């Protein structure tokens, strides 16, 4: 049987005013909605690609943690840019955030525009070992 947990507007996460969940946890998987350069009040913060990427990844990692997962559980990341010329900067941060031989699968692509005029959006999936989940529930 599938159990679902909806992660919405928890302390330490951006306070979204739109009707979405930060993440949905189903069984041993966590599906994280697109994270932007948004502060904890839910206000978009424009900046350089480096600043926006750090903030978006910070939000992404916070959602993962509030969902009961860790960075090591992340198996897939989807990154949308408004300009692929920014990819080398994001690649550098990505290599700092994830160990060389344990990096999640990833897609990157360019979109025409992102909400609030942002430069990047990050979403992804994390998976816990079922044995690990069983141990947490007992």
How does the language model describe each region?
Residues 1-58, 62-75, 81-138:
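N-terminal presequence-like segments and the immediate start of the first folded domain
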